[in-house]
Curated annotation (Swiss-Prot):
Superkingdom of the source species: Bacteria
Coiled coil: none
Gene name of the record: rimP
Any one of the GO CC terms: cytosol
Gene Ontology terms: biological process: ribosomal small subunit assembly; translation
Pfam family, one: RimP_N
InterPro entries: Ribosome_maturation_RimP, RimP_C, RimP_C_sf, RimP_N, RimP_N_sf
PANTHER family noted in UniProt: RIBOSOME MATURATION FACTOR RIMP
Protein name per the record: Ribosome maturation factor RimP
Entry's localization field: Cytoplasm
Organism lineage string: Bacteria, Pseudomonadati, Pseudomonadota, Gammaproteobacteria, Aeromonadales
Similarity comment text for this entry: Belongs to the RimP family.
UniProt keyword annotations, A-Z: Cytoplasm, Ribosome biogenesis
Main location: cytoplasm
Function noted in UniProt: Required for maturation of 30S ribosomal subunits.
């Protein structure tokens, strides 16, 4: 059975692409009565506030018709930003050589938090280099991952 995020991705991908953007990812954060649906869009030339407004209008109209979320929620449409979330193995592959932070669902070697250079992506396995040592992490065990901006 598909997760809510997967169903929303299937629903929203084509309309976002039709607007000329990439659907970077979706996060649904449950928080009491008012949850938040975050829709990240991207474009090679960056994303403006007007781009977010255009996509938000389209997404909101589509969600009103399809009604895939039965509870109350806030809709946020934004760029993934410089510290963008890495939500798919393809995101890690796009940023090989860059530094990322990773938080695991279940500890590996008594450790849940990692910060290292993305070295390799092999299917569902992500390799980070941390202090000269490679750590291989299963994508399915990643709770959260973000790119660390490089200002050099």
């Amino acid at each position: 059975m598909a997760t809510l995020e997967q169903r929303l991705t299937e629903l929203l991908d084509a309309p976002i692409v039709a607007l000329g953007y990439e659907l970077w990812g979706i996060e649904f954060i449950r928080a009491g009565k008012h949850s938040t649906l975050r829709v990240y869009i991207d474009h090679a030339n960056g994303i403006s506030v007007d781009d977010c407004a255009e996509a938000s209008h389209q997404v909101s109209a589509l969600l009103d018709v399809e009604d895939p979320i039965t509870t109350e929620y806030y809709l946020e449409v934004s760029s993934p930003g410089m510290d963008r979330p890495l939500l798919k193995p393809e995101h890690f592959a796009r940023y090989i050589g860059q530094v990322a932070t990773v938080t695991l669902r279940m500890a590996v070697n008594n450790r849940r938090k990692y910060k290292g250079t993305i070295k390799q992506v092999d299917g569902e396995m992500i390799t980070l280099t941390i202090d000269g040592r490679d750590e291989i992490l299963a994508f399915a065990n990643i709770q959260q991952a973000n790119l660390i901006p490089n200002f050099d």
